[in-house]
Amino acid sequence: MTTAVERFLKYVSYDTQSDEAYDTCPSTEKQLLLANELKRELEEMGASDVRMSEYGYLFACIPDNTDSTSAPQEAEASFSTASAHGASDVGQKATIPALGFISHIDTAPSLTGTNVKPRIVQAYDGKDIVLNAEKQIVMKVSEFPFLADLKGQDLIVTDGTTLLGADDKAGVAEIMTMAEYFL
């Protein structure tokens, strides 16, 4: 199974920078390159009903993997809507509510997404992070005090010359890894 980190590092290599000059969805064709890769991955995993809209929205289904007739008693409470859908008899399969996960793939137009150079800072030491020594780009703890809370964690950073796209592409990597797990 591919890890979320492996997926994330792959996905950040796709330039999905948006362009505010266009009132289209997606605002750039290059966003479709990653969307098509995600579609291919979902199909390869065995997701059902994998489809992309004319606007680049990607959808897929993961079939339920529960058999409510053999679910433990405690689980029945968590599916409180099951009896409302007519599955109150013992031995009848309950209707389990669907759950959706959403993420976007476009990155901000303010900084390029081309030639992203991610790097993993292992066991972050709590000090300033030199993103790019040559260009003197440093992520200073004094400017980003939340970094103190991340001491000891592995961090994925860029070299400071591009966006990493971490908000969206990390979400996509997590969703895809979860999908693979359940499929």
What does each of the following model-derived ranges do?
Residues 1-4, 27-31, 35, 168-171:
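Generic structural signal for well-ordered, non-membrane alpha-helical segments
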Residues 2-29, 157:
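N-terminal capping segment at the start of a domain
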Residues 7-10, 37-40, 174-177, 181:
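Alpha-helical scaffold segments in soluble metabolic enzymes
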Residues 10-17, 43-47, 180-183:
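Generic secondary-structure signature for well-ordered alpha-helical cores
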Residues 18-19, 67, 106-110:
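Short, acidic Gly/Pro/Ser/Thr-rich loop/turn segments
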Residues 23-67, 95-96, 100-102:
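A non-catalytic alpha/beta surface segment that caps or lines the substrate-entry region
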Residues 66-95:
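Intrinsically disordered, low-complexity terminal tails and inter-domain linkers enriched
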Residues 95-174, 178-183:
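Active-site metal-coordination/substrate-binding segment of hydrolases
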